[in-house]
């Protein structure tokens, strides 16, 4: 609730209520069955992983690992000089299992540079071990203007990022 709740529209006063409700559900379920709430990924997608595991018998696994394995992503990355990726917001959640953060880590492990485009960036210093450079649309124009004309501002931001790559 504390990590993803605000991103999904949960107000500050509602976070403790949601957290308490989810903890209660996890406690009730663990008394009946297992400690699924402790499984990595059980809190992802608003607790969808937990619910599907408990009530439908689904196996929780990393979506990034699944798809990167299917696409043979490490082999593809090793054949290139750089990776360019993007996300609406780059922040501390980016490196907590989100696909774009996992891609950046994989690129670094493959000795490949990784660049990112985003709508906005929070705490760029924390992201610097994973990305060679990041560019945000809101650095060029106010957030509302960027949202209203995202394609234009994304193109300009990508152009600026390309100049950084060429240096």
Model-found features: residue ranges?
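N-terminal loops that bind phosphate or other acidic moieties
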Residues: 1-167
């Amino acid at each position: 609730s504390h990590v993803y709740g605000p991103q999904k529209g949960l107000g500050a006063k509602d976070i403790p209520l949601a957290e308490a409700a989810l903890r209660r559900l996890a406690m009730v379920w663990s008394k009946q069955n297992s400690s699924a709430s402790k499984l990595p990924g059980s809190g992802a997608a608003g607790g969808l992983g937990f619910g599907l595991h408990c009530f439908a018998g689904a196996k929780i696994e990393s979506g990034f690992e699944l798809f990167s394995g299917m696409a043979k992503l490490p082999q593809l990355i090793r054949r290139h000089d750089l990776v360019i990726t993007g996300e609406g917001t780059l922040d501390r959640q980016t490196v907590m299992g989100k696909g774009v953060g996992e891609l950046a880590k994989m690129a670094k492990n493959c000795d490949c540079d990784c660049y990112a485009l985003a709508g906005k960036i929070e705490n760029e210093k924390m992201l610097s071990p994973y990305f060679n450079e990041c560019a945000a649309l809101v650095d060029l124009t106010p957030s509302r203007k960027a949202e209203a004309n995202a394609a234009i501002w994304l193109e300009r931001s990508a152009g600026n990022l390309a100049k950084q790559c060429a240096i």
